[in-house]
UniProtKB/Swiss-Prot annotation:
It comes from the Archaea. Pfam families: eRF1_1, eRF1_3. It is found in: Cytoplasm. One of its GO terms (cellular component) is cytoplasm. Gene3D superfamilies: 3.30.1330.30, eRF1 domain 2 (3.30.420.60), Pelota, domain A (2.30.30.870). The N-terminal domain has the RNA-binding Sm fold. It harbors the endoribonuclease activity. Belongs to the eukaryotic release factor 1 family. Pelota subfamily. This is Protein pelota homolog. HAMAP family: PelO. It comes from Saccharolobus solfataricus (strain ATCC 35092 / DSM 1617 / JCM 11322 / P2). InterPro entries: eFR1_2_sf, eRF1_1_Pelota, eRF1_3, Pelota/DOM34_N, Pelota_arc, Ribosomal_eL30-like_sf, Transl-rel_pelota. May function in recognizing stalled ribosomes, interact with stem-loop structures in stalled mRNA molecules, and effect endonucleolytic cleavage of the mRNA. May play a role in the release non-functional ribosomes and degradation of damaged mRNAs. Has endoribonuclease activity.
Length: 344
């Protein structure tokens, strides 16, 4: 995401959309009665015919729809302004926002926490492709803020099938991996697996992709369980420290360890966490993003809490439904805080 302009007087932010993560964030921050200015198309009657006409409109937002990994955000609302010759003011309309588009978002008042989220998103540039490989299977995935997208999950030909099968299988993986690298243009590749096969794959990848950074790591299997394992590793933090999905999993693991050994350093529940924030005791808070889409009063309360945490140098991690820790956190009321010190 690029922030092209912020007009404080109009409370208008102009953005250029660069990734699915950007669309996901806009889905979270767009609220009913916000206004958006964007290019769109609409069927317009021209005599006896109708044609789909491109135009720029102002839309008063009703609600948004986002389906992860579709590269599109649908913004539903009422047309507040459009070229008069088309006579469509007041009509219902849906703007399809895609990667590469620009949009202006106008709010009555931009919340500092939400603006800071936009700025953090604009500073995110790193992306990594993860390939887990073993002699008989492999998995290729890419992390987004809203979850992990599995790009490929396949079995390989058995080792006893023919001579040179290890090299052939390594080339098969490397060739497919190279295609995904061209598509997603990651900053780095993480190759992980239980044996030496990952080194064979790395050689083939290096032969195809000359200037792409490759990290090697060990993992127990080339499966989804192995993927969950590698997401908790320090190597992931090293490569993509700004991806909350990896950080969130590690923080949740820390919270569970503290609950077992030092439960006084963890609290959960809206009122309990709010109390801890007021005392300046919160080091990290994890919150499911559903709570930011709940009724207006609760959402405003949570937004103020999160802003207060960051003002006191605490860390906020928003957990989407696609996160591996989502249901675990939801079962703990949806909001949990790791504390700097014990409180009553």
């Amino acid at each position: 995401m690029r922030i092209l302009e912020f007009d404080e007087k109009r409370q208008a932010v102009k953005l250029h959309i660069e990734s699915e993560d950007d669309l996901w964030l806009l889905h979270l921050i767009l609220e009913k009665d916000d206004k958006v200015v964007a290019k769109t198309t609409r069927d317009v009657g021209l005599g006896k015919e109708s044609r789909r006409i491109p135009m720029t409109i102002i839309l008063k937002v009703d609600y948004t729809e986002f389906q992860e990994f579709t590269n599109r955000l649908r913004i539903h609302g009422i047309i507040e302004d459009a070229p008069e010759r088309f006579g469509i003011k007041g009509a219902h309309h849906t703007i399809n926002l895609d990667i590469g588009d620009e949009i202006i978002i106008i709010k009555q008042q931009w919340n500092k926490y939400v603006l800071d989220r936009l700025k953090r998103q604009a500073n995110k540039r790193s992306r990594i492709i993860i390939a887990l490989v073993d002699f008989d299977e492999y998995l290729i995935a890419i992390p987004f803020e809203q979850g992990i997208k599995i790009l490929s999950e396949k079995s390989l030909r058995p080792l006893n099938e023919e001579e040179g099968i290890i090299e052939q299988n390594a080339l098969e993986i490397a060739t497919e991996l190279a295609e995904y690298v061209k598509q997603y243009d990651p900053d780095a590749i993480l190759l992980a697996g239980p044996g030496f096969f990952k080194e064979e794959v790395s050689k083939k990848v290096n032969a195809i992709l000359k200037n792409k950074k490759i990290y090697i790591d060990s993992v127990s299997s080339a499966t989804r369980a192995g993927l969950h394992e590698v997401l908790k590793r320090d190597i992931i933090d090293k490569i993509m420290t700004d991806y909350e999905i990896a950080i969130g999993a590690k923080k949740m693991e820390k919270a569970m360890e503290l609950l077992a050994k030092q439960p006084e350093l963890v609290t959960y529940g809206l009122e309990q966490v709010k109390n801890a924030i007021e005392m300046g005791a919160v080091e990290t808070v994890l919150v499911i993003e559903d709570l930011l889409s709940s009724d207006e009063q609760e959402r405003l309360t949570i937004e103020r809490m999160l802003e207060d945490i960051e003002n006191k140098r605490g860390e906020v991690i928003l957990v989407p439904k696609e996160s591996p820790i989502y249901f675990e956190l939801k079962n703990l009321t949806g909001i949990l805080a790791i504390l700097r010190f014990r409180i009553n």
